[in-house]
Amino acid sequence: MPSLSSLCPDIVLIGAGIMSSTLAALLRELDPSLSMVMFETLSDCGQESSYAWNNAGTGHAGNCELNYTPQRADGSVDISKALAVNTEFDLSRQLWAHWVREGRIADPAAFVQPCPHISLVWGAENVAFLKARYEAMVAHHCFADMEYTDDPAVIAQWAPLAMAGRDTTQPVAATRIREGTDVNFGALTHALTASLKTDRSVSIHYNHRVTDLTRTEDGRWRVTATDTESGHAITVLTRFVFIGAGGNALPLLQKSGIPEATHYAGFPVSGLWLRCTDPAITRQHHAKVYGKAPVGSPPMSVPHLDTRVIDGKSCLLFGPYAGFSTKFLKSGSWTDYFRSLTPKNIIPALTAGKDNLGLLDYLVKQVIQTNEARFQALLDFYPTARPEDWSKVVAGQRVQIIRPDSGLHGKLRFGTELVKNADRSLVAVLGASPGASIAASVALQVVQGCFPERLVEGDWLPRLRQVFPAYGVDLTQDAAACATLRRDTAQVLGIASEAG
């Protein structure tokens, strides 16, 4: 017979990816007495956007992603977004280091590896931009370790494959931060859920699709999940629901009926990678090398040639190549997008489409792009690449947020966003990049935004300070605290850089 805590849990989490597993593990740190139920449609955790080959595993820290540092009209570079992403990743480092110290995660090398983050550009205009970006960033303590060079010989030491066979008459430049990371968010999700399953107050139900999410008269949430194999349904009552279901978060949010979600819509974007697993090639490249997106293309199109370490093996990934699919998840239905349109969000969706014809044009061109054209993009990064060494891999689905910015006029937003109802009893994660890299930041925002009454000295606050040693400290302003924190977390996680 099911226990009372499993029928009336304190917390229900929908989705068993990196977002839900991170929040569940953090809540357990703050209050081990909380009972939690997690529902996942698939047969295991971390199989959608958290799965290693469904995301770039960059450990987004604003080091190399040029779309986070736009150039102003006067030629100066705005680094505010890069700083925000950079210090959000510090939250992830603090949380992961805490779990390693506490034994929640046995081996950090199973999910995080040191990997330099490099920005590479060519052409006089792009070189001038990168130099201006470097000067703006290296002046701030968060990026003080950034290196810059326009010497092809030095770049060849940093990223040999990127320079072999390159036209040396063309201006080229690069920046590097040695202490970057490659993160296997699928492996991290598995480690967290394995730890959660040892707790009798946590119940995880795989092969269970949430089919109903309604409010009861007493203010609780009735959540019904149906076993996708047997058809048997489970119904639980809870005071708090977290929707961390990736692309499927929007339909679930709509199912809840909260007014805050009324006009939200989603725009699904699929993706492709090229992958190389030949050790003779992969051993020659150890870095995340990000380029500059073509003029007029969306932020999601920033090309990069990445080292990935998956299941202990080093691989190379290049992309992303965008596409269009009406699915909200890789395992979803072709009808997902159409079923998400309602009388209240179709106008925001249409106006967002009208305002983003450039994006639509880009996606159409990407969809009809030939394999030869895709490979040409790789040759821009790796001039001596051979087609026979690379295979095509379908990436995870992303659902970009569309929300009204004035009246019913919809605005397409790139990023990750939390949507919660007025009494803070339900919250959902919407959006895409930086996504998994800021799971710790998202979890902390949920705690702060939905449980403020518990963040006091006699309750969760002291423990929260233990989990996040720099809690309440603005790392963008406190250089000493930032340096200490990064040194300590690098040592615990085994990601300290080596000179060279």
Swiss-Prot record:
HAMAP family in alphabetical order: MQO (MF_00212)
Classification via NCBIfam families: mal_quin_oxido (TIGR01320), PRK05257.1-1 (NF003603), PRK05257.1-4 (NF003605), PRK05257.2-1 (NF003606), PRK05257.2-4 (NF003608), PRK05257.3-2 (NF003611), PRK13339.1 (NF009875)
EC numbers: 1.1.5.4
One GO molecular-function entry: L-malate dehydrogenase (quinone) activity
Pfam families for the chain: Mqo
Lineage: Bacteria, Pseudomonadati, Pseudomonadota, Alphaproteobacteria, Acetobacterales
Pathway(s): Carbohydrate metabolism; tricarboxylic acid cycle; oxaloacetate from (S)-malate (quinone route): step 1/1
The name this protein goes by in its record: Probable malate:quinone oxidoreductase
Catalytic reaction equation(s): (S)-malate + a quinone = a quinol + oxaloacetate
Keywords linked to the UniProt accession: FAD, Flavoprotein, Oxidoreductase, Tricarboxylic acid cycle
UniProt GO BP: tricarboxylic acid cycle
Taxonomic source organism: Gluconobacter oxydans (strain 621H) (Gluconobacter suboxydans)
